[in-house]
Every structure is written in C-alpha cells, then in structure tokens.
Amino acid sequence: MTRVSFKAQMLRAREEAIVASVNRLLAEKGFDAMTVDAVAADVGIAKASLYKHFSSKEELAGAAMIAALDRAIAQVELLAQDASHATELDRLKALARWTMQVQLAGEMPSLPSQNSALRAALVANKAYGDRLIRLSDLLGDWIICGQHAGRLDPELPPEVVLYTLFAKACDPVLSLLKAGGSYSDEQIIEMLTRTCFTGLAR
C-alpha cells in the first residue's frame, strides 16, 4: 500500500473542509449570495490558498454537488440492502424522506437553475455527470420495477417520476412549513411524502 504523505493528507483535509463549507453556505445562502471570500473566511484560509484547490465559484459548487451525489448514491445502496424496505416503492419513499431530512437539516446545497455559467461548468464536469447518471440509473431501475409491479403509475414516463423525486431535494414547501413553526420536521416530511406519492385527492 502506498503511504500518503503528511502534506497530501493536509491538502486533502483542507479540500474536504472547503467542500463542507461550500455545501453549508449553498444551503444557507444559495449560489448567488455565496462568495469565494466567505468560503475562505469560513474555512480560515487565504483566498489564494483556496484557489489552489478550486479555480472558480462554479468549480466550488460543482465539488459540493459531487459530494451531495456521492451521499445520495450511498443512501440508495444502503436502502437496496435494507430488508425493511422490501419493495421499490418503499425504497423510493425512504429516499424521498431522507432527502427532505437532509434539506431540513440545512445540508442540501441549493443551486439556481438559470445561471448559464454554473450550468456550463456542471455540464463540463465529468465527475458530476458520471455521478448524476449513476444515481439516475439506480433510481430508474426502481421506478421501472415499481411501474411493472403496479405500485407506481405505469402511465407516467419514468423520467417524470425521477425528476419529481429530484425536486424533493429543493422543495420550497419544506422551508415554508418549517418557518411557520406549526409542524415538527417529522410531520413535515410525512405530509410531503404523502403528497408526493399519494397526491392531494382523497
């Protein structure tokens, strides 16, 4: 086994601290309000040192999204091995709940959909693209199996179900209900899981 040098370990630890800071700032402020200066100050390093790891604000956001996708993929793989979630529908519901828990905890990065520079950077980021495809494929298998088993509406295109699940990661209803203070996190998650999978009709 190749031994990692102390310097390499320190650089890796600093990079992880930067990504963790970006993730939190994106969740709290959003991409437009987050600044490179704020990230550097939060980590406790000079901006010049930060640029040794990431060349732009867009690259910082990409690193945070890669970390978020890695976390989601790990959760999917965990659910796939959990006997308490026997059906694909059970697993999709569990993943939706987990996603909302992460958002309510302030750990889900929030990115704008209309920022052309950010979109171009993410499209060009192979690591991000590979993980997004991996997660989509894993969930796509569950969705198609669930439709074939009659547990999910077979008339809906699978991508509609997939994008609906992805939307739970940035659902504004979560923060609105939490800010209202009338419901616990558990109640909010349960209600939004019901509206996602059962709908609004009685």
Predicted regions and their residues:
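Basic, helix-initiating cap at the start of DNA-binding domains
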Residues: 1-29, 33-42, 59
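C-terminal peripheral helix-coil segments that are non-catalytic and often amphipathic
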Residues: 1-2, 94-98, 137, 141-149, ...
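Short amphipathic alpha-helical elements of helix-turn-helix/winged-helix folds
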Residues: 21-25, 98, 102, 168
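Short hydrophobic/aromatic patch on the recognition helix
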Residues: 44-54
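Alpha-helical DNA-contacting segments of helix-turn-helix folds
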Residues: 61-68
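Hydrophobic alpha-helical connector segments
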Residues: 63, 77-107, 158-165, 186
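Amphipathic alpha-helical segments used for helix-helix packing
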Residues: 102-123
